[in-house]
A protein has these predicted regions:
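Active-site pocket scaffolds in enzymes
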Residues: 43, 228-293
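Asparagine-centered strand-capping/turn motif at beta-strand->loop junctions
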Residues: 14, 127-133, 244, 292
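Hydrophobic residues embedded in beta-strands of well-ordered beta-sheets
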Residues: 3, 21-22, 89-90, 123-125, ...
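Active-site/ligand-binding surface loops and adjacent short beta/alpha elements
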Residues: 149, 153-234
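Acidic, contiguous internal or C-terminal segments within carbohydrate-active enzymes
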Residues: 5, 96-98, 102-147, 151
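Beta-strand-rich N-terminal accessory domains
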Residues: 1-47, 51-62, 66-70, 215-236, ...
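Short solvent-exposed loop/turn micro-motifs enriched in small/polar/acidic residues
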Residues: 51-53, 73-78, 107-111, 155, ...
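Extended, loop-rich substrate-binding clefts of extracytoplasmic carbohydrate-active enzymes
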Residues: 65, 69-120
Length: 293
């Protein structure tokens, strides 16, 4: 089921299937990728309790539990419940108490709330992760919104760019195409020009663009030379992934709290970069904002 939230500047739709966006519209223009099974059927999946992938889809935890999780975790494939809806805010909930089968692969009782709040021409997305168990709970959380690119007919993908808040000079780490895991010793030249990342389908011929060393906490998708577009602000997320398919008319700009297993990491979940740990009954919150310019 879909729920709509709107004000005078922006309208969004959120589905109980995956708990996330199916539409972000302003001034009669759709900004969110609408999904195409022949290219990428996703739109804005929520990554939980991992971001990216684990080596052999499995890991151990300090508590001795075996975790078995497919890429990006299970939250994006579950049916969520509407928790609340008001004039400018709605919240979706996924809880292990409603689906005990989730505990077989991730043995940590949890409640995950995705809260969507309209603020003028922006929507603030907050992920609230609560440890409902009696042990420390390791986890990762991240967003994966895909935006239409180009936005208008007659435009080319290469007409667009991502403008970062700051210059990002660090070389980029590389994902191994066959596994999606990260080789930290094999770094590639940063394709940015100053503060901008020119977009082209060739940029994604082999893998996503992974900013594991990142100064910016804000990035804007827009046509070259124009100010209008979509701005993503992601304070609290240490990593940013930029991804598309070579044949896809979209670009995913993904604030992540963690990364796929790296070549210098073992298979203990808490040893992975960016791992968050919630104490029993603790709620950890991470947020990002999508603003239409």
């Amino acid at each position: 089921m879909e729920y709509t939230l709107s004000n005078d500047s922006i309208s969004i739709k959120v589905s109980t299937a995956g708990g996330s966006f199916t539409s972000i519209e302003a001034d009669g223009r759709e900004y969110l990728w609408q999904g195409d099974p022949a290219v990428w059927s996703g739109q804005a999946p929520i990554c939980f309790p991992i971001c990216g992938g684990l080596r052999d889809n499995s890991a151990m935890t300090f508590a001795g539990h075996h975790v078995k999780l497919a890429r990006h975790g299970f939250a994006r494939k579950q049916e969520w419940k509407l928790l609340s809806q008001g004039k400018n805010e709605l919240a979706m909930c996924l809880a292990s108490e409603d689906n005990a089968a989730l505990l077989s692969d991730y043995p940590y009782p949890f409640k995950l709330v995705a809260r969507y709040t309209l603020e003028d021409a922006a929507v603030r997305v907050s992920y609230e992760v609560t440890n409902e168990g009696t042990e420390d709970m390791p986890f990762f959380i991240g967003g994966h919104p895909g935006f239409r690119c180009p936005l208008d007919e007659g435009e080319a993908y290469t007409d667009y760019e991502l403008r970062f808040e700051k210059e990002e000079a660090a070389e980029l780490c590389t994902a191994v195409p066959s596994t999606g895991l990260i080789d930290v010793d094999k770094r590639s030249k940063n394709p940015m020009v100053g503060k901008t990342l020119p977009l082209s389908h060739e940029l994604f011929d082999f893998a996503e663009t992974i900013f594991d060393v990142l100064e910016s906490r804000q990035v804007t998708l827009s046509k070259k030379g124009e100010d209008k577009g979509v701005r993503l602000s992601f304070e609290g997320f240490p990593y940013l992934i930029v991804w598309s398919k070579p044949e896809g008319d979209f670009v995913a700009v993904e604030p992540w709290g963690g990364l796929s297993t790296c070549s210098d990491e073992d298979d203990v979940l808490e040893h992975k970069r960016g791992c968050l740990v919630a104490k029993p009954k603790e709620t950890v919150v991470r947020s990002f904002t999508i603003e239409i310019l």
